[in-house]
């Protein structure tokens, strides 16, 4: 058994205690707040476990982490999907980046900020001291 999370190319990110990989095509996952028009805000995650952690924190009203406004959600499923991600970000006024507190995550935020400027918010500062949002939720410090 495993948890599978679909992407926009019909592939699936798959996780279980023994396996972390992709079935079919590797791509980003876009989860709109509602059908039709995009929101003005998007929350960007490196992996779907961080996205699920965000949803858990949102249910507990963690205002230190979560955005109190309607948002679309974009899961990169790997920082290697940055180029694909950049094309989807252009339609948003506010880009909230919940990426890992490591070199790859920070370089990715810098690249996005270099392209979209002041509309980019590095939310990883809210969970400094933790590798990622999932570790923050679990209380597992670096």
Predicted segments with their positions:
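Phosphate-handling DNA/RNA-contact segment within nucleic-acid enzymes
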Residues: 1-88
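TOPRIM fold recognition
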Residues: 56-142
């Amino acid at each position: 058994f495993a948890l599978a999370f679909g992407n926009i190319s019909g592939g699936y990110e798959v996780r279980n205690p023994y396996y972390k990989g992709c079935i079919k095509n590797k791509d980003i996952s876009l989860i709109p707040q509602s059908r039709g028009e995009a929101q003005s805000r998007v929350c960007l995650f490196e992996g779907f476990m961080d996205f699920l952690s965000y949803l858990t924190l949102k249910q507990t009203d963690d205002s230190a982490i979560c955005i109190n406004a309607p948002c679309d959600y974009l899961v990169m499923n790997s920082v290697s999907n940055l180029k694909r991600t950049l094309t989807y970000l252009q339609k948003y006024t506010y880009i909230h980046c919940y990426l890992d507190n490591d070199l790859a995550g920070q370089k990715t935020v810098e690249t996005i900020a270099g392209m979209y400027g002041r509309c980019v918010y590095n939310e990883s500062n809210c969970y400094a001291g933790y590798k990622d949002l999932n570790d923050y939720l679990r209380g597992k410090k670096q």
